[in-house]
């Protein structure tokens, strides 16, 4: 068994569930811009994930955008980035690698119902290869 495990290609065996971290910075649109800004400050993040009432991933809002929304009284819906990289919990690392190489933000990990389960950063993907 040890020989098999040592010889297995980690990139084709490990999936997002194995390397992801639980998302710690998230909000609902109904929480408002001040809440989002305070969460980012409190947790030390420059972006925040937006989820629906049942944790479905809606998108992401950056620190710069939320500050602009507050200054210019812009709706969070108008500044939310909807087209963000996402994978499922079962996506293997070899399929995540090219996404991570191009991603500006951590990759969202969703389950079969589209609910946010975790995030995967470039560092997490690279460290899984070691």
Go through each PLM region and give its residues.
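Short low-complexity stretches enriched in small and charged residues
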Residues: 3-7, 37, 62-65
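Bateman (tandem CBS) regulatory domains
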Residues: 12-26, 62, 72-84
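The conserved cystathionine-beta-synthase
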Residues: 26-46, 50-54, 67-70, 85-113, ...
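Short hydrophobic-aromatic micro-motifs
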Residues: 60-61, 120
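Phosphate-coordinating loops and pocket residues in cytosolic domains that bind phosphorylated ligands
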Residues: 3-6, 21, 68, 72, ...
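C-terminal boundary and immediately downstream tail of ABC-type ATPase nucleotide-binding domains
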Residues: 1-22, 130
